[in-house]
Curated annotation (Swiss-Prot):
Physiological role: Member of the two-component regulatory system NtrB/NtrC, which controls expression of the nitrogen-regulated (ntr) genes in response to nitrogen limitation. Phosphorylated NtrC binds directly to DNA and stimulates the formation of open promoter-sigma54-RNA polymerase complexes.
PANTHER family the record matches: DNA-BINDING TRANSCRIPTIONAL REGULATOR NTRC, TRANSCRIPTIONAL REGULATORY PROTEIN
UniProt entry tagged with the keyword Oxidoreductase: no
Protein name: DNA-binding transcriptional regulator NtrC
DNA bind region: 445-464
Annotated SMART domains: AAA, REC
Main subcellular location of this protein, as a coarse class: cytoplasm
The entry's keywords: Activator, ATP-binding, Cytoplasm, DNA-binding, Nitrogen fixation, Nucleotide-binding, Phosphoprotein, Repressor, Transcription, Transcription regulation, Two-component regulatory system
A GO CC term attached to the entry: protein-DNA complex
Residues that, per the record, bind ATP: 168-175, 231-240
Encoding gene, per UniProt annotation: glnG
Pfam families named in the record: HTH_8, Response_reg, Sigma54_activat
Annotated organism of origin: Salmonella typhimurium (strain LT2 / SGSC1412 / ATCC 700720)
Residue numbers of 4-aspartylphosphate PTMs: D54
Amino acid sequence: MQRGIVWVVDDDSSIRWVLERALAGAGLTCTTFENGNEVLAALASKTPDVLLSDIRMPGMDGLALLKQIKQRHPMLPVIIMTAHSDLDAAVSAYQQGAFDYLPKPFDIDEAVALVERAISHYQEQQQPRNIEVNGPTTDMIGEAPAMQDVFRIIGRLSRSSISVLINGESGTGKELVAHALHRHSPRAKAPFIALNMAAIPKDLIESELFGHEKGAFTGANTIRQGRFEQADGGTLFLDEIGDMPLDVQTRLLRVLADGQFYRVGGYAPVKVDVRIIAATHQNLERRVQEGKFREDLFHRLNVIRIHLPPLRERREDIPRLARHFLQVAARELGVEAKLLHPETETALTRLAWPGNVRQLENTCRWLTVMAAGQEVLIQDLPGELFEASTPDSPSHLPPDSWATLLAQWADRALRSGHQNLLSEAQPELERTLLTTALRHTQGHKQEAARLLGWGRNTLTRKLKELGME
């Protein structure tokens, strides 16, 4: 690849300085600008190979600049940078035709690699997308790298009606992602219909999906449209697809292949144009191996896969999510939003959250009603949060194991506002081990030291430190 010319526009001089030196170190020619008007003036006489632009700047913002650049130089790749890493920023950037989206703070080596990829793209004369989608905003929040990947995928799919499979534990927000995919798609003005396979009795699933004719079975007194007909032109979201019975999987596969189906008890084919988004918390590959899910249907659905991380893998998002849910709960209840004490925020980020984002949302709703003061303290948090297995604790251990008992003690201490837990617990732990080992060896110190994995001198020093001599 030929070395290229890079322009950087950002009102933050430190960002300009860092990028200019990093790009120059990679052998690229870099020119920096403080605002969008300077860039447009320079574009009148010359053009770079790639432009990096901040999204929020005084005067003309990055998206307005991007729009003008795409009108004048539609092939010029533009990378949008932002410290406000949310779904709307990502989708808006892609809608306006951005080459990519770079959330701050970014790894400088990754930024340089992205610039080089954009230059290669430009030099190969590939046309970037110019996406025009209008849709309502969503409540998706996430600055964690895994969530940024999700936002990118949604942005890149915003011109497409391709099938998507969403994987993630219960409570991670799979339906929210499905809504976002629909809202930021060409089908945004058409229906979005959701159906949970696990919530419907097996003998009613076919009727729910495909509808039925009058008299098709006992109680079918009228013709009824199924979910496919209701979603015609739009999106059908099939949640917990792994629970779909095999015979219904066969019918679904035929609909996906032919674009038509028969109502239960019907003889006339019904044609539909529906985008399928499926979701599951199960491992579908394993279900296929076990013969519980059709392999051909799996491949038909698994065109694009989105993995939603559990909350424990995106802990940096917990404070922002909690503040958001407290605001939402306050609006719902018509009260002033609660505030989180800094120690409470820290405690929330350390919890296990087996119910993921849904559990955090419900906790914030509970706090809005039950917390005594306007500021939420650690002791205000519901006890079951601490009684559940803590992050990194072996939840598979029996309830009377020492690790479980230690975790319960730590939970109680943290709820009471204790600090320096290690300095409090370590002497007691060592004293207990020493006492037990000496009792086991009938006071023989060298043998006790061997059992504990210490040298004789270490054991003697510990006895002195703990006042056990």
